[in-house]
From Swiss-Prot:
Cytoplasmic side: 1-16, 69-148, 192-256, 303-361
Cellular component terms (Gene Ontology): axon; dendrite; membrane; neuronal cell body; plasma membrane
Organism: Drosophila melanogaster
Subcellular location: Cell membrane
Protein name: Putative gustatory receptor 22a
Transmembrane feature ranges: 17-37, 48-68, 149-169, 171-191, 257-277, 282-302, 362-382
Protein task: Probable gustatory receptor which mediates acceptance or avoidance behavior, depending on its substrates.
Glycosylation sites: 44, 278
One Gene Ontology term from the biological process aspect of the record: monoatomic ion transmembrane transport
Tissue occurrence: Expressed in neurons of the terminal external chemosensory organ of larvae.
Chief site of localization: membrane
Keywords, comma-separated and alphabetical: Cell membrane, Glycoprotein, Membrane, Receptor, Transducer, Transmembrane, Transmembrane helix
GO function terms (MF aspect): ligand-gated monoatomic ion channel activity; taste receptor activity
Membrane topology, from the record: Multi-pass membrane protein
Length: 394
């Protein structure tokens, strides 16, 4: 029993470290324009941090675009010269990435006043209610936070390996620094949203735990406080509202980020097929290690973002299932029964969903379709460009 407890203790410490590292890193990169008042336990929007973030991020973006070093990559030069379609697709991916970066920064800063209101309300709910209602440690929360931090590290590491690892390439260090700090900033902004979603999941998990505890007590013949059920309903409704507002703030940024991952996977998959067909022209390191690791990490990042949203949605659905346990309780008083009925009706009319742009419900079903579509796009490009896949001998 001591070994699992030790593991959970380590995971809790790692999760706390990841959250703090994200917070301090966001301050340094100018992505979190808020100061924390420890006395009032409130976040305050800082105009100085807003200005610092805009100047820093736009400067880094301009610097990352200034150097003309598209020919630093020997594989890119070889493929571009012999296959114009790959160059056109790669230019399209760069445009999508640029738009994603610009919109991410501008929209995040422009919606910061609304974001600070949401975060402050979550802080109040956590301090006044959820910290007192928690019955046990939420290990899933810790695991997801750790995995998210690990994915960020792997994404940056993967990009650096691609940049510096390809043989016979001209390295421009300051260009790499600017480019990958900009990439890190976008990853961190998306991480802010996913951390908010996983916090909402944890609060829903606490509500479900309270409802299960009440159902167990009723089965044993004990009484429960109807006002506690009313409080849980109010907390549940507040979480749904905050989730909707958070999604509205981040939906464009997260959608564009997913589109960027989607397009990068297409171009990397296409280039990998070309390298495999012309295996004698390229290093085995490139074919078997560099490009495959980039694909795997990108798919993991894409799927993990989907998993965060699906976890919150499925936990909201579990609330309705837990409330059904009260249906066969014979010893409920009328007031408790009325409160449970109100909660059940509310859950039947309103469900927690992470819906981007009012169109995309982010869950496992949608994620599976996205990944299949991603693979089909690569297959389509290979079929469309079939005659140019095999390089002609010089």
């Amino acid at each position: 029993m001591s070994q699992p407890k030790r593991i959970h203790r380590i995971c809790k410490g790692l999760a706390r470290f990841t959250i703090r590292a994200t917070l301090y890193g966001s301050w340094v990169l100018g992505l979190f324009p808020f100061t924390f008042d420890s006395r009032k336990r409130r976040l305050n929007r800082s105009k100085w941090l807003l200005a610092y973030g805009l100047v820093l991020n736009l400067t880094l973006l301009v610097l990352s675009m200034l150097p003309s070093t598209d020919d630093h990559n020997s594989v890119k030069v070889e493929v571009f010269q012999r296959n114009p379609l790959v160059k056109q697709v790669e230019e399209l991916v760069e445009v999508i990435s640029l738009i994603t970066t610009l919109v991410t920064h501008l929209r995040t800063f422009s919606r910061s006043s609304e974001l600070v209101e949401i975060l402050n309300e979550l802080l109040v709910l956590d301090k006044n209610h959820f910290s007192k209602l928690m019955l046990s440690e939420c290990h899933t929360f810790n695991r997801y936070v750790i995995e998210k931090g690990l994915v960020i590290i792997l994404e940056i590491g993967s990009s650096l390996v691609l940049y510096f690892g390809i043989p016979n390439s001209k390295i421009v260090v300051y260009e790499a620094v600017c480019i990958y700090i900009v990439q890190l900033e976008v990853l961190m902004v998306v991480m802010h949203f996913h951390l908010a979603v996983i916090y909402i999941y944890r609060y829903l998990w606490i509500i479900n735990g309270q409802l299960l505890d009440m159902a167990s007590r009723l089965r044993r013949g004990d009484s429960v406080d109807p006002d506690r059920i009313q409080l849980l309903l109010w907390l549940y409704s507040r979480l749904l509202d905050l989730n909707h507002r958070l999604t509205a703030i981040y939906d464009i940024q997260v959608t564009l980020f997913m589109a960027t991952l989607f397009s990068v996977n297409i171009i990397v998959g296409h280039v990998l097929v070309i390298c495999w067909i012309n295996i004698t022209r390229f290093s085995l390191l490139v074919i078997f290690l560099l490009f495959p690791q980039a694909l795997i990490i990108n798919f993991w990042d894409l799927w993990q973002g989907i998993a965060f949203c699906d976890l919150a949605e499925s936990t909201g659905k579990k609330t309705s299932m837990i409330l059904k346990l009260f249906n066969d309780m014979e010893n409920m008083d009328q007031e408790t029964e009325r409160r449970v009925t109100e909660f059940t009706l509310f859950c039947s009319h309103r469900r927690l969903k992470v819906c981007h742009l009012g169109l995309l419900d982010i869950n496992y079903e949608m994620g599976f379709r996205m990944i299949i579509t991603n693979i089909l796009y690569v297959v389509f490009l290979v079929q469309f460009d079939y005659m140019n896949l095999k390089f002609k001998t010089d």
